[in-house]
Amino acid sequence: MKLDRPAILVVDMLNDFVTGALACDRGKGIVPATAALLDAAREAGVPVIFCNDAHLPGIDREFELWGPHAIAGSEGAQVIPELKVGEKDYVVPKRR
């Protein structure tokens, strides 16, 4: 990936934040437009980067505030199916 060109950064569009443990109604509302943007970006060769919560039980203090969510490897920590991580996309886990 060249570092001198634009990219699309998608943050925390995960099952737990859109339909699960910490669902946000506004998150659901942006899904169609986000999916269309990602399709257009990929078609144009613009890199797509997903930056996602991937918490580790027993380590992450965020659970004290919000309860368990987006646990690494769980269904809740997966990108929502409507946005489909592509084979050329990048996925960056956020641990804390």
Language-model segment annotations:
Residues 1-91:
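Active-site acidic carboxylates
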